[in-house]
Amino acid sequence: MISADNAHGVHPNYTEKADPVNRPYLNKGIVIKHSANQKYCTDGYSAAVFKDICRQAGVPFQTFTNRSDMPGGSTLGNISMAQVSVNAVDIGLPQLAMHSPYETAGVEDTDYFIKAAAVFFE
């Protein structure tokens, strides 16, 4: 199962807010979201399966990890996994200024998601 939402991209005005290693950028691919606190449903297996889907679709992917020293968001993916035991991955398209009046996302990432979704549903 895919839990599809958006993902925090590295904001050029607030680069220090992003994880120093996992830094999603706009128009650089679909983001696979991980959380050591299980705020996302992604595990090693589901991430590997989704990476293979991206490779088959010919689209790039990136990773996002919540910083360990700062609270972060979550999705409904981890909540639903408590009710239904299926393999699932939390993904999103990177955007700037999530939950603000002016969110910004990359149009190429939308095309990447459409291609990956087509492979997933085949």
PLM regions and their residue ranges:
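Structured mid-domain segments that build the active-site/substrate or prosthetic-cofactor binding neighborhood
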Residues: A118
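Active-site-adjacent substrate-binding region
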Residues: H11-Y14, A18-A105
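Short, glycine/acidic-enriched loop or turn micro-motifs at the edges of active sites
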Residues: H8
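A glycine-rich helix N-cap at a beta->alpha junction
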Residues: M1-I2
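Short secondary-structure subsegments characteristic of cysteine-rich extracellular domains
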Residues: G106-K115
